[in-house]
Amino acid sequence: MYDTVIFDLDGTLLDTLEDLTDGVNHVLSERGYRTRSIDEIRRFVGHGVAALMRLALPEETDDGIYAAALADFRRYYTANCRAKTRPYNGVAELLTELKARGIKTAIVSNKNDEAVKALAEYYFLGLTAGAVGGRADKPLKPAPDAVLEAMRMLGAKGGSTLYVGDSEVDKET
């Protein structure tokens, strides 16, 4: 029996794809690059925003332009991450039911830590015990570090914890 459930955020609890696409395309268009379709962005997500921007930018982009574009994306996305993002149908009810049954929940994402915490607080305040996002001092999923951090935060044990996600990266986690 599971007493703890840790969820991925993007594509699992929240539909963030339109805001991610808008953020990437804002950065690309400001630099005169071709913008990307929502389907292209869907294929690029899962390994964190650094990988997302690396894939979205032209292949020959030098490291200086990449670093500036990544910083611009982080600023833009953090300021606009709730414009079109919505929880999937039934997510709030699921989290409410898990809480009522005494099952602890948390969120783990490769998205930057500041945005993860802001989204979790805005959409799921009181429904999850916390959120862990990507940070420079920890490897991203599929490395287990963020999930293990969430488990420590919740006082959870491996054999009674379920991790739920939507991507190959989540499967490898």
Residue ranges and their predicted role:
Residues 1-43, 54-57:
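Active-site neighborhood of HAD-like aspartate-dependent phosphohydrolases
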Residues 3, 101-104, 160:
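Structural signature of beta-strand start/N-cap positions in the alpha/beta core
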Residues 6, 13, 87, 105-108, ...:
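Conserved SAM-binding loop
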Residues 19, 48, 93, 114-115, ...:
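Short alpha-helical
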Residues 24, 91-121:
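Substrate-recognition element of Asp-dependent hydrolases with the DxDx(T/V) motif
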Residues 27-28, 48-62, 119, 150-151:
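Helix-loop "lid/cap" segments that line or gate small-molecule binding pockets
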Residues 54-93, 101:
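Metal-dependent phosphoesterase signature
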Residues 83-86, 112-173:
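Substrate-recognition "cap/lid" segment bordering the active-site pocket of phosphatases
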